[in-house]
A protein has these predicted regions:
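GG-anchored amphipathic helix commonly corresponding to the ABC/SMC/Rad50 NBD signature/C-loop
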Residues: 1-4, 28
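Walker B catalytic acidic pair
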Residues: 7-8
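C-terminal lobe/lid and adjacent interdomain/linker elements of RecA-like ASCE P-loop ATPase modules
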Residues: 16-103
Length: 103
């Protein structure tokens, strides 16, 4: 299966255009493997699998970790991407976005 990697494909776009890009990527993913690095929830909600990459420093050494998220953790992450992981309105919006996303 051909693989496409898009690193920060959301650079310079937002909202509605991000949703259109997310749909286009979902369409490509029906026949190809697609890996997307994004900061836009409009793109992230289209993913079949959602991974969160976290960076930090431990003992003076830069570290990275990758975690697959599902269910409520995914709602929380989309709400975080919307700007308010603990806010009820952002969580409702995240749930709506995930519910509307077509995979």
């Amino acid at each position: 299966i051909p693989t496409f990697v898009f690193d920060e494909i959301d650079q310079g776009i937002g909202g509605e255009v991000g949703g259109q890009v997310g749909q286009a990527l979902a369409d490509v993913a029906t026949e190809h493997q697609v890996l997307v690095i994004t900061h836009l929830p409009q793109i992230a909600v289209r993913a079949d699998r959602h991974l969160v990459v976290s960076k930090g420093v431990e003992g003076g050494v830069a570290t990275s970790s990758v975690e697959t998220i599902l269910g409520e953790d995914r709602v929380t992450e989309i709400a975080r991407m919307l700007g308010d992981p603990d806010g009820a309105a952002a969580r409702r919006h995240a749930e709506e976005m995930l519910g509307r996303a077509v995979h």
